């Protein structure tokens, strides 16, 4: 090892005796933390020696002494770079911070560089130091280098006080300037070096290291971070280690870093040139492939004589030609051409190309400017509607009005006003089987338009209406767009079937999506999520069908024109069965028109006694069953065609009637009244039964059964309170209610019921119970009752009167304020019923209860049943 060179210092140097830990082709600068693998014998021996023997030092170089570990100094080693087997003259004093085992086995030591040092002369190992690398102290080895561990003098160099050895730090002292000037120069060099290092680290994406470097304020510490730099050679790092002067270190680092950045710029320029060349070659390859495809298509066209099948239909050029030739709105054409441009830039193997082609096919398939010519022959349109459906005059009149208005607009040249055309949104509400769905086809045929049915029952995904966004795999347009594409025109009749069966879940609310579709003020600019272009729906005739209006949100119902289909009369059912149902079922049974003849009396019996519904589905099923019986008897030889069926023959084919008038039987006893109600299947007859508990065994209060809702329970309470407060006026023994409980029951018990219209029926039943006068068997009633006895209006009058007519009742009591609703009731039903319009409960009781006779006239007294009902005029 070379002798210690001369170093000019301002005070006495600090000399320590430390074990040498050689580093092959590596340099540790002060401030660096390194992990040393102790599988190397020299490394392990040096670490063990430092930990067992410590270091020796003295502030006076002329009288050095050895201090023990007990003095508090941490275990230190001298990290000496070794290049080509030779130890360098400069080294780093390192503190052993931790020794431990590695996860994969073996051990390692964590050493932190603390100061620069010059390597001095060889010293004997301290007493008690392990010099063999085995970790066992040998008390007899007090001199020499030991077996594997060398101890030397380490002259610690102070960056702030020392002048580097040799020519590295101007040994002649020619550099002028005060300490303040030197500090300013060092700060300037540090800022410049920090900027270069930060730029280099940002290029590499080492953002965490950038933050660490930016946090260093000491110039010397900043310069020593160069020990981590991979672009510096070992010789350059040794030169930095031997340069205590901070300014000189920073100058050299600036020179080396700038040279490295220049090399990086040249390498980046070369890489960019190579990449541009590759891109140019790839672009040229794609263009040549497209040119070959165009030439191939041209040659095929020439060979086929210009036939339409020559084009592939899947190439971007073909899509561009189709878009330019199609009759598209300007905004749609611009969007389609933009997608064609994307398709031309897309690789054939990219899945995006398939998505673009699907979108273009959808756009090109839509009939953007195709509209069916409306049939303005109003008389012919009405004839079509009458031929397909009996009754339903409200709907037919509305369609005729729509056609008349469109013809008027066409004559006046008002096809489009404010961007909107003359479409309509109608809601057909009514019980099942009244012909709501089939009516849509008849309307389309009468108007000369195409018809599309969109089934919405059970739909819970908002995307089913507005479409899926194209970012999703397998995206499709919504049902409205698909219906327009299927119809082939922009003004079809679209039937939104079962709109009240829509549901909502985590995927959205389809009814909210329908708000834009069915709003005449918005649907001329409808935007499907898949198409993302405006679609004009203002010329579409939307027909929405529903059974229960309460299930439709109010904002959606507000956007539709409501038309109620309350059901058919018995005569209308007979006409429908004779003109439509019978012919259809004859075909399904394989019978000719003259093989089976069903008389009108038999059809009346089927409609009134074997079925009792608002629609005609059960009636059609009964006809089908009847014809099957006939076919079976013919096959068995029990009958021969042709067969004529009258009302008396039905029992032999279908058994006894299922529905017979029961009002007379139920109301024969006091306490039972007949009411009218509206259900999801139309109108129905409702019976209210009341009874009084025995005075000795029954408790007080009122008991309500029959799955009654809150409103219906309140109606019973109001009825009882009214009778208690007006019992004297009505000549009713209300004193019996003091200690006798009242029970009100509304069959059938398994069916939930609610609503205010049963109030008058409950009042009549309780009055009948208290007076002992039965309710007339031919009377039905409906209306809400107040505490003062006023009869208030209710809804569903048409359906309730149809139900009363079906049940064979002849007298109906209605609130006075429901008089205008009688205009909606079919004339045959109005003529068959005696309708009394009442305003007070007293009128109801006078009309509904059987008259009471005293004993002097030989009749019954109050509290007993007996005499037959007497008809009363309104």
UniProtKB/Swiss-Prot annotation:
Induction conditions: By heat shock.
GO cellular component annotations of the record: cytoplasm
Domain Lon N-terminal: 18-261
Keyword Cytoplasm: yes
Domain Lon proteolytic: residue ranges: 667-851
Protein family membership: Belongs to the peptidase S16 family.
Record text on subunit structure and interactions: Homohexamer. Organized in a ring with a central cavity.
Top EC class of this enzyme: hydrolase
Active site positions: 757, 800
Reactions this protein catalyses: Hydrolysis of proteins in presence of ATP
Region (Disordered), start-end ranges: 47-68, 120-144, 298-318, 853-874
Pfam hit, one: Lon_lid
Provenance organism: Frankia alni (strain DSM 45986 / CECT 9034 / ACN14a)
Entry's Gene Ontology BP terms: cellular response to heat; protein quality control for misfolded or incompletely synthesized proteins
Protein name as annotated: Lon protease
Gene (name only): lon
Annotated positions binding ATP: 430-437
């Amino acid at each position: 090892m070379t002798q210690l060179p001369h170093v000019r210092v301002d005070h006495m140097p600090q000399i320590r005796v430390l074990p040498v830990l050689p580093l092959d082709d590596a340099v540790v600068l002060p401030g660096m933390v390194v992990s040393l693998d102790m599988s190397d014998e020299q490394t392990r021996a040096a670490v063990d020696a430092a930990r067992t023997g410590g270091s020796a030092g003295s502030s006076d170089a002329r009288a050095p002494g050895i201090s023990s570990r007990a003095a508090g100094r941490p275990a230190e080693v001298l990290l000496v770079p070794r290049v080509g087997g030779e130890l360098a003259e400069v080294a780093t004093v390192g503190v052993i911070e931790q020794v431990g085992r590695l996860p994969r086995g073996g051990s390692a030591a964590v050493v932190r560089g603390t100061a620069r040092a010059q390597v001095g002369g060889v010293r004997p190992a301290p007493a008690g130091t392990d010099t063999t690398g085995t970790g066992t102290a040998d008390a007899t080895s007090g001199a020499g280098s030991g077996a594997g561990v060398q101890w030397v003098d380490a002259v610690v160099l102070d960056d702030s006080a020392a002048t580097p050895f040799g020519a590295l730090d101007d040994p002649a002292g020619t550099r002028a300037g005060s300490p303040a000037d030197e500090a300013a120069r060092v700060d300037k060099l540090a800022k410049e070096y920090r900027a270069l290092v930060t730029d280099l680290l940002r290029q590499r994406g080492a953002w965490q290291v950038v933050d660490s470097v930016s946090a260093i304020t000491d110039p010397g510490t900043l310069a020593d971070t160069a020990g981590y730099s991979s672009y510096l050679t070992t010789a350059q790092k040794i030169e930095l280690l031997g340069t205590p002067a901070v300014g000189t270190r920073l100058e050299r680092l600036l020179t080396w870093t700038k040279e490295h950045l220049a090399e990086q710029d040249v390498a980046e320029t070369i890489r960019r040139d190579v990449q541009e060349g590759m891109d140019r070659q790839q672009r040229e390859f794609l263009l040549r492939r497209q040119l070959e495809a165009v030439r191939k298509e041209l040659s095929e066209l020439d060979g086929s004589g210009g036939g339409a099948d020559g084009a592939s239909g899947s190439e971007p050029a073909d899509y561009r030609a189709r878009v330019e030739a199609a009759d598209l709105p300007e905004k749609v054409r611009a969007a389609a051409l933009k997608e064609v441009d994307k398709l031309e830039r897309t690789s054939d193997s990219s899945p995006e190309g398939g998505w673009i082609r699907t979108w273009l096919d959808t756009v090109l398939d839509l009939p953007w400017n195709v509209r069916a010519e409306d049939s303005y022959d109003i008389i012919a349109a009405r004839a079509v509607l009458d031929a397909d459906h009996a009754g339903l005059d409200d709907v037919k009149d509305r369609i005729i009005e729509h056609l008349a208005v469109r013809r008027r607009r066409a004559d006046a040249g008002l096809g489009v006003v404010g961007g909107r055309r003359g479409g309509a949104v109608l809601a057909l509400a009514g019980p099942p089987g009244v012909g709501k769905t089939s009516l849509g086809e008849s309307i389309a045929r009468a108007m000369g338009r195409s018809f599309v049915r969109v089934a919405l029952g059970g739909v819970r995904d908002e995307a089913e209406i507005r479409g899926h966004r194209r970012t999703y795999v397998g995206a499709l347009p919504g049902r409205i767009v698909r219906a327009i594409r299927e119809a082939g025109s922009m003004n079809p009749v679209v039937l939104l079937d079962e709109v009240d069966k829509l549901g909502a879940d985590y995927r959205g609310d389809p009814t909210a999506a329908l708000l834009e579709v069915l709003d005449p003020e918005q649907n001329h600019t409808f935007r499907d999520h898949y198409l993302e272009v405006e679609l004009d729906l203002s010329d579409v005739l939307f027909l929405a069908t529903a059974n229960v209006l309460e299930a439709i949100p109010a904002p959606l119902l507000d956007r539709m024109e409501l038309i109620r289909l309350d059901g058919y009369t018995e005569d209308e059912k007979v006409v429908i069965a004779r003109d439509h149902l019978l012919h259809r079922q004859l075909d399904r049974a394989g019978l000719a028109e003259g093989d089976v003849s069903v008389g009108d009396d038999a059809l009346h019996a089927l409609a009134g006694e074997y079925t009792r519904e608002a629609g005609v589905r059960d009636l059609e099923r009964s006809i089908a069953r009847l014809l099957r019986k006939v076919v079976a008897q013919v096959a068995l030889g029990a009958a021969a065609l042709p067969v004529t069926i009258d009302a008396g023959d039905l029992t032999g084919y279908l058994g006894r009637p299922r529905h017979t008038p029961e009002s007379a039987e139920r109301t024969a006893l006091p306490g039972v009244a007949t009411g009218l109600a509206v259900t999801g299947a139309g109108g129905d007859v409702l019976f209210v039964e009341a009874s009084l508990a025995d005075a000795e065994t029954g408790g007080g209060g009122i008991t309500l059964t029959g799955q009654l809702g809150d409103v219906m329970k309140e109606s019973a309470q109001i009825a009882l309170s009214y009778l208690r407060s007006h019992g004297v006026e009505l000549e009713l023994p209300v004193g019996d209610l003091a200690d006798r409980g009242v029970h009100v029951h509304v069959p059938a018990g398994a069916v939930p019921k609610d609503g205010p219209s049963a109030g008058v029926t409950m009042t009549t039943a309780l009055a009948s119970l208290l007076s002992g006068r039965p309710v007339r068997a031919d009377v039905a009633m409906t209306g809400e009752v107040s505490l003062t006895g006023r009869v208030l209006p209710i809804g569903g009058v048409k359906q309730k009167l149809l139900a009363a007519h079906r049940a064979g009742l002849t007298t109906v009591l209605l609130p006075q304020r429901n008089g205008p609703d009688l205009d909606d009731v079919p004339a045959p039903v109005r003529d068959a019923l005696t309708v009394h319009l009442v305003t007070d409960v007293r009128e109801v009781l006078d009309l509904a209860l059987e008259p009471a006779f005293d004993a002097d006239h030989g009749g019954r007294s109050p509290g007993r049943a007996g005499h037959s009902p007497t008809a009363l005029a309104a």
